[in-house]
Structure formats: C-alpha cells, structure tokens
C-alpha cells in the first residue's frame, strides 16, 4: 500500500502536502514536524508521536487510539471528532487546541497533558 511507505510519507511531510485519510498505524514518527498539515481522518492508531510537532494541524476525525503523544506539541490543533482512547499524553501540550470534548479533556489531563484549561 503506497501510503504506508515511510519514504512516501516523509516526502509528503517535507513538501507540506496533505495527508488526509492516510494510514500511518503503528509507525514510529517521533520528532517529526507535522505542523499545520492536513491530517483529517488519518489513522494514527498506535503511532509513536513522542516529541512530534503537530501545532496547527487539522486532526479532525483522526484516529489516535493508543498513540504515544509524550511531549508532543498539539497547540492550536483541530481535534473535533478525533479519537484519543488509550493515548499516552504525558507532557503533551494542547494549548489552544479546539474540538475536544469535556471527557477527552479530562482524560488527557489525567494522563499528564498540559494546556487544557
């Protein structure tokens, strides 16, 4: 499957191209800069996104189930409909993020996320 090829993904990130609907399940993408990218409906289940930059990204309806978001920056990210069940979020920053439900905010806070007040 072409969109699971890491070189393909990194080329799109580098060129700042849309990643809408992409399948990135279980990939190691720590420290990658996804800032301001379109990641709507992306499947990021089980991804390691520790220290990744997702500032201003559109993660509407993205699947982040069991994603590792430790120390990731999701400031000003659009997260309406995003699934964050089981996400590890210690030290992750969500300052100015939009679209999170009250229950998701409480869950993320309980996991050590910041910027959710």
Regions found by a protein language model. Name each.
Residues 1-117:
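Tandem repeat scaffolds
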